């Protein structure tokens, strides 16, 4: 079964309180989501593979560790996941960015891909899927399935807030994918919103309803 990491750093929890607040406007909301994403990325990337190289300082030659291979690909789930990308790129500026857009067919309830643009070398990269909310878990699980079909092997999921139901769903669908969240909330309500949650992340990021 995959590992679930709840990142309870004081700075993250402080900023998360203002993200939740319904009186926080879109400008501040966007900035806070970006800041929390950057802070979370530090923990999410903790176990990236390393390799040893030799460099020369002004004093002598020495061996140092650097990231191995082709590094990271960040893949936001449209559209709310876009709000997390800039913060992560501040910490991992060399990362490539892919995009996945999915919706569910109302009759078949099956996922329908309406947009997918990924780095050609996605199979060689450590992939971090980002979405502010992990509610039912359906969209995240579908996005991960799509990534695996495109060849991705090392995948992590990073969300600001999750429901217990969403975590359980993704773990059952993808027991090999570790999940990182800033907070695991109480439950989903009858409308599929996380309680207490933060409302609709996409609407709050982009000022829409």
UniProtKB/Swiss-Prot annotation:
The molecular function terms of the Gene Ontology recorded here are: GTP binding; magnesium ion binding; uracil phosphoribosyltransferase activity
Q: What controls its activity? A: Allosterically activated by GTP.
Instruction: Report the EC code(s) recorded for this entry.
Output: 2.4.2.9
- Where, by residue number, does uracil bind? 194, 199-201
What does the entry list as the binding residues for 5-phospho-alpha-D-ribose 1-diphosphate?
79, 104, 131-139, 200
**Coiled-coil regions listed:** none
Needs which cofactor?
A: Mg(2+)
Q: Name one GO biological process term.
A: uracil salvage
Q: Which cysteines are joined by disulfide bonds?
A: none
Top-level EC class: transferase
User: Per the record, what are the reactions this protein catalyses?
Assistant: UMP + diphosphate = 5-phospho-alpha-D-ribose 1-diphosphate + uracil
This entry's comment on the bound cofactor is:
Binds 1 Mg(2+) ion per subunit. The magnesium is bound as Mg-PRPP.
UniProt KW keywords: Allosteric enzyme, Glycosyltransferase, GTP-binding, Magnesium, Nucleotide-binding, Transferase
Supply the CDD domains for this chain.
PRTases_typeI
Annotated pathway: Pyrimidine metabolism; UMP biosynthesis via salvage pathway; UMP from uracil: step 1/1
Question: Which family is this protein grouped under?
Answer: Belongs to the UPRTase family.
Quote the function comment for this protein: Catalyzes the conversion of uracil and 5-phospho-alpha-D-ribose 1-diphosphate (PRPP) to UMP and diphosphate.
Query: What's the name of the protein?
Result: Uracil phosphoribosyltransferase
Q: Which classification does the entry list for the species?
A: Bacteria, Bacillati, Bacillota, Clostridia, Eubacteriales
């Amino acid at each position: 079964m995959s590992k679930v990491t709840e990142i309870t750093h004081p700075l993250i929890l402080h900023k998360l309180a203002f993200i939740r607040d319904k009186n926080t406007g879109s400008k501040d909301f966007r900035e806070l989501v970006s800041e929390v994403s950057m802070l979370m990325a530090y923990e999410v990337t903790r176990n990236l593979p390393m390799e040893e190289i030799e460099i020369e300082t002004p004093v002598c030659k020495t061996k140092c560790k650097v990231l191995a291979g082709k590094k990271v690909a960040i893949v936001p789930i449209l559209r709310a996941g876009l709000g997390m990308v800039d913060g992560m790129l501040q910490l991992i500026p060399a990362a490539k960015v892919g995009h996945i857009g999915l919706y569910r067919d109302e009759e078949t309830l099956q996922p329908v891909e309406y947009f997918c643009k990924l780095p050609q070398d996605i199979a060689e990269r450590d992939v971090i899927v980002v979405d502010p909310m992990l509610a039912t878990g359906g969209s995240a699980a579908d996005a991960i399935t799509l990534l695996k079909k495109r060849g991705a092997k090392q995948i992590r999921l990073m969300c600001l807030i999750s429901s217990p139901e969403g975590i359980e769903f993704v773990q059952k669908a993808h027991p090999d994918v570790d999940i990182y969240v800033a907070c695991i909330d109480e439950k989903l309500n009858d409308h599929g919103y996380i309680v207490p949650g933060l409302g609709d992340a996409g609407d709050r990021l982009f000022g829409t309803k």
